[in-house]
């Protein structure tokens, strides 16, 4: 059973998924079908841009009033939201479920260093 906060998160996230998809579609990014590999590569490219900003000191974005890493992390999430809506994936619910699952895991499970 979802609590009030989780239910609100799902509602808000799914609303933003629709908005992200519509903005992308309205700007011509859904005119041709992309394969799943392309979609993932575009998400990855945003993470690579975040890495480059951090390598250069994480200066301000050229577009919005945030750091470059903040902007690129936002771009990753926007791309995920766009894809999630297009593919009819329940990412908001999966986030909640995964966080609950992670809470139950042992400290540094699997003996991993990072």
Region locations from a protein language model:
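Flexible "arm" and connector segments at domain edges
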Residues: 1-114
């Amino acid at each position: 059973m979802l609590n009030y906060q989780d239910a609100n998160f799902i509602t808000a996230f799914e609303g933003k998924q629709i908005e992200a998809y519509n903005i992308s579609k309205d700007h011509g990014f859904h005119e041709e079908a992309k394969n799943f590999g392309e979609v993932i590569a575009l998400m990855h490219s945003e993470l690579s841009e975040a890495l480059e900003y951090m390598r250069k000191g994480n200066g301000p974005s050229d577009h919005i009033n945030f750091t470059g890493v903040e902007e690129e992390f936002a771009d990753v999430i926007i791309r995920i939201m766009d894809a999630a809506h297009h593919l009819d994936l329940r990412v908001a619910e999966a986030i909640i479920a995964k966080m609950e699952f992670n809470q139950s895991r042992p400290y540094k499970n699997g003996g991993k260093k990072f």
